[in-house]
């Protein structure tokens, strides 16, 4: 089975990365296996909602500013989520406090990468990546073709997937 690095663009992407993600989760692990970074609380909650609507038994934890970090820590330590969804600033806080083991994370997804850069999360995302020694797969999702994608991640043969044709392509048809 050949693994590829990819960059997904445009809309309709949440299920496109959540469904295959289920195949990578180890059932008897009990540790955080996947980290999904997002630029906003709203997107974190939306992704969590989509994941819960899928009806899996996997647990998630949303971590974002404006929410009590003590409650998030309690959820992480008590519920043993396989997936943590959060903003870069809050994830950095949890890592600095040792609230979860970053060594068990094998997949990193950065959703709305372009927005995360726009909101100034470059340094936090770069720092988080350095703390994930077991990382095997990275996925960046972006509505725009940000120049920083290959340079930021070290991805060298990205696969770009467009879920909807550009307006110019529609007019040509």
Protein language model regions, located:
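Post-DEXD/H (motif II) to motif III coupling segment of the RecA-like Helicase ATP-binding lobe
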Residues: 101-167
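Conserved phosphate-coupling serine/threonine residues in phosphotransfer and NTP-handling enzymes
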Residues: 9-11, 40, 87, 142
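Walker A/P-loop NTP-binding motif
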Residues: 14-29, 50-53
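Alpha-helical scaffold elements adjacent to nucleotide-binding pockets in ATP/GTP-utilizing enzyme cores
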Residues: 20, 46-50, 90, 124, ...
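Conserved interdomain hinge at the start of the Helicase C-terminal
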Residues: 171-173
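Short, small-residue-biased leader/transition segments that mark boundaries at the very start
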Residues: 3-8
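Conserved nucleic-acid-binding Ia/Ib motif block in the N-terminal RecA-like helicase ATPase lobe
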Residues: 30-96, 104-107
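Catalytic P-loop NTPase motifs of RecA-like helicase/translocase cores
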Residues: 12, 70, 91-92, 116-117, ...
């Amino acid at each position: 089975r050949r693994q590829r690095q990819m960059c997904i663009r445009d809309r309709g992407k949440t299920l496109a990365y959540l469904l295959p993600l289920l195949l990578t989760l180890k059932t008897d692990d009990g540790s955080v296996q996947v980290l999904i970074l997002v630029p906003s609380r709203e997107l974190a909650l939306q992704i969590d909602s989509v994941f819960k609507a899928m009806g899996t038994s996997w647990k998630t934890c949303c971590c974002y500013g404006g929410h009590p970090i003590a409650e998030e820590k309690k959820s992480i330590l008590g519920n043993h989520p396989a997936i943590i969804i959060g903003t870069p600033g809050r994830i950095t806080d949890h890592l600095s406090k040792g609230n979860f083991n970053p060594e068990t994370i094998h997949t990193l997804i950065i959703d709305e990468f372009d927005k995360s850069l726009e909101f100034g999360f470059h340094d936090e995302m770069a720092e988080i990546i350095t703390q994930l020694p077991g990382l095997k797969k990275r996925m960046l999702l972006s509505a725009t073709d940000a120049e920083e994608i290959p340079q930021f991640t070290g991805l060298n043969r990205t696969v770009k997937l467009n879920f909807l044709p550009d307006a110019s392509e529609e007019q040509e048809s």
